A protein has these predicted regions:
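A general structural motif
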Residues: 2-4, 39, 65, 126, ...
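Charged helix-capping and loop-helix junction motifs
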Residues: 24-27, 143-145
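Active-site phosphate-binding/coordination module
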Residues: 25-121
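Alpha-helix termination/capping residues and helix-transition junctions
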Residues: 1, 59-62, 191-193
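Asp-based phosphoryl-transfer active-site loop
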Residues: 2-21
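Conserved phosphate-coordination/catalytic loops
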Residues: 21-25, 100, 176-180
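Conserved acidic, metal-coordinating active-site core of Asp-based
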Residues: 104-197
Length: 197
């Protein structure tokens, strides 16, 4: 039996252009040819939510993936044709970090913090709480306040701070501590029984 290879790539600024960075002209054709190999299981990895990933796949005519890690690692999908199946086993692993609290309960704890504005519902996920903020040069004070508020409920969290360069907007994602793109990828590789080579 031929061994299976898990090929994972981030989308923005790796496989696809984003912002002012130009696309490498041969990247997609070469990638498409490689991804079509029968021994390849393809995973796209993104900080973005499902709808944006689906749009990027369509817009750039990317090969259909077998798996998608989205929401900065808070979501893991198995893709079968046009059907995206959320991996419940991944959700169970990361949900433990929030100590039984849900998305809305954690959001309520942060409601009084100034300069945080909850992102649209389409950009939220069961295990990802996303906010807009001022594009701070040093977000350390804000991040300390967020950690302090969420420590009240013993939630173990991972804070992801970034700035959208196109809109000059600060972005804060709050995830379970064990949710990350790398951890989701390691979980997927292990669940597929693909050795690390």
């Amino acid at each position: 039996m031929e061994s299976i290879m898990l090929v994972a790539t981030d989308l923005d600024r790796t496989l696809l252009p984003n912002g002012q960075q130009a696309e490498s002209p041969l990247a997609r054709p070469l990638f498409r040819r490689f991804a079509s190999r029968p021994d390849v299981r393809l995973a796209y990895v993104s900080g973005r939510h499902r709808a944006v990933v689906e749009d990027a796949i369509a817009e750039y005519d990317l090969p259909k993936p077998d798996f998608v890690i989205g929401d900065v690692g808070a979501s893991l999908y198995e893709v079968r044709g046009d059907t995206w199946l959320a991996r419940a086993d991944w959700c169970e692993v990361i949900a433990k970090d929030w100590a039984g609290y849900g998305h809305d309960e954690l959001a309520a704890l942060l409601a009084a913090l100034p300069n945080l504005r909850l992102q649209e519902a389409s950009k939220q996920a069961p295990h990802k709480l996303s906010y807009y903020a001022e594009p701070l040069a040093d977000p350390a004070v804000l991040l300390v306040r967020v950690r302090r508020e969420l420590a009240q409920v013993a939630a173990r969290i991972n804070l992801i701070w970034s700035v959208d360069e196109t809109t000059h907007t600060g972005l804060l994602d709050i995830l379970p501590a064990s949710a990350s793109k790398l951890h989701a990828l390691e979980f997927l590789r292990t669940s597929l029984r693909i050795p690390l080579e």
